[in-house]
């Protein structure tokens, strides 16, 4: 009764709405139906951007290979929408997915997703990041709207340490072979190619969102050369686009394992 009374006043209504949006959004229990009877939860206010890119703009539609997927690794899973989208395309074939995500906010949502009865038998969640395992952990900058990164944008940003996963942890958590590894952790694409040869050698396709400022230092051409050295060839790519919020370019490439 008190809440109903307070919402009559614009000031209190705005304060309550603000608190729900930023602190209790998941309590609203919002989910959106996608294809073939699957649903995508919207656990936080900033999840709509990722949902829009994948389900409305069909960001991955024209770049993924035309195969049936059995086992994948989703590196930089965000809220798990890539995996949900891929599963919704093949409703009669269960998709086993290892969701790797460094963000504290996203990992809470992914853990809830993995408990969902529709996904509980096929999703595994791992809180961690891709990097040089010799360093054990790295700084991570939490930002809303898919802007989290291992790179600092300003000296005022706060950070926290995230565990770097090694190859054996990934292989034991989700045994190979893999039909696809998708990597979308800003700046970690180079580390994936340099420090996880046993993992990617047992993968049929690599789907990488590249960033021209990756830690290798020489942009997309360096990534392409590294893929060639690892016996992968580029089979599809998106057009490069100017990055949002910083200088540089971004794009996606699909690479096929020639030894697979």
Predicted regions and their residues:
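Phosphate/nucleotide-binding beta-alpha loop and adjacent structural elements of enzyme active sites
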Residues: 1-260
